[in-house]
Amino acid sequence: MNSSMLGLATTFSLTLLAFAAPAVSHAQGSATATGGLPFEVKPVGTFDSPWAMAFLPNGNVLVTQKEGAMILFDPATGTRRTMSGTPAVSSKGQGALMDIVPAPDFAASKLLYFSYAEAGPGADSRVVLATAALDQASGSLKATKVLFRGQYALTGGHYSGRIGLSPDGKYLFFTSGDRQLFDPAQDPKSTLGKVLRLNLDGTPAAGNPLAARGFHAAVWSYGHRNLLGMAFDRQGRLWEMEMGPRHGDEINLIKPGLNYGWPKASNGNHYDGRDIPDHAPGDGFEAPKVSWNPAISPGGLAYYDADLFPKWKDSLFITGLSGKSLDRIALDGENARKVDHWDMGERIRAVRTGPEGALWLLEDGPRGRLLMLTPKR
């Protein structure tokens, strides 16, 4: 396969179809399309193309929106406030004000980590990781500092931009998509198509596994496409979810220094129908733990280990955009399997575990709802 043969304009337009396509049939495998939902769904608020959410210690939730707004929302009262001081965002294509994660010491420091797409010269853009202090009293972000800037690319897709904090709170993990350029995912000098491990100040963390082999010093793993979810489990294992090409969406167990294959291996195909070699034993690439064919176009991932849904402890939850779905993946050590698939009727962008153990979803689109999922009574 010669990935560079794809025309850039064709690739861009076809990739965007995954974000705007009608529903696709549910994931194949051991998952079941549950008839009727085993939870109550309560709409709590409506947002303009929401992208991500983060709960604060006082129960409020921060919601990012595609065009660049950050909303402080009180689920109990429905009151909301748009934060001032947010950066300028490039919202073309898949650009947005993206992920948001409170610092481990947020109660004292008020620090947030967030990501966004930044416009560059001409039509170029890049993904940015930044930090700022949240002043809830004044409704503003203060002392904003950029921690990492990705490489510029002409396309408006595959920014990724998901943020994870290591369980010990010492490191930032950050996903940098391939920007629809394919080959940089295998390029040691590029940060595109990679999982990065950074110190809290944005510098490459010492001990990253590939620096001695000539890779960019921040690289933790490589061979990735469009990484749209990341979460640590109770044992500190890092799980990552990414959107495949034409099908082949996948969940990976991220280990330091490994090559996850893109664009040389995928369980999907190119959008024009050309084959990509499937993952196979002995091919030198780390295969996904779970993949989907047909695609669900995953939007977000969360790890669940709370008590409100006791039978779902130690599970991953995956949202579907084109799939209009919520999937549960049961974990067993380093293994994962599909167990539940629920039709949610709308494109689902994000999922999080709330303070009391409820699951919270964000619908995609200009009137995307914030939904609270609790056990059916």
Annotate each PLM feature.
Residues 9-21:
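Bacterial N-terminal signal peptides
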Residues 26-40, 139-141, 203-212, 267-282:
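Blade/loop signatures of beta-propeller domains
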Residues 26-182, 229, 237-240, 244, ...:
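Acidic, Gly/Ser/Thr-rich repeat motifs that build Ca2+-stabilized beta-propeller blades
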Residues 75, 132-139, 196-205, 255-260, ...:
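Short loop/turn segments immediately following beta-strands, especially the blade-tip
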Residues 181-190:
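Acidic/polar, solvent-exposed loop segments in beta-strand-rich repeat domains
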Residues 196, 249, 253-281:
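Mobile, glycine-enriched helix-loop/loop "lid" segments at the mouths of ligand-binding/catalytic clefts
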Residues 215-250, 255:
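Repeat-solenoid scaffold signature
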Residues 335-355:
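Conserved blade-ending motifs and adjacent loop-strand segments that build the rim/top face
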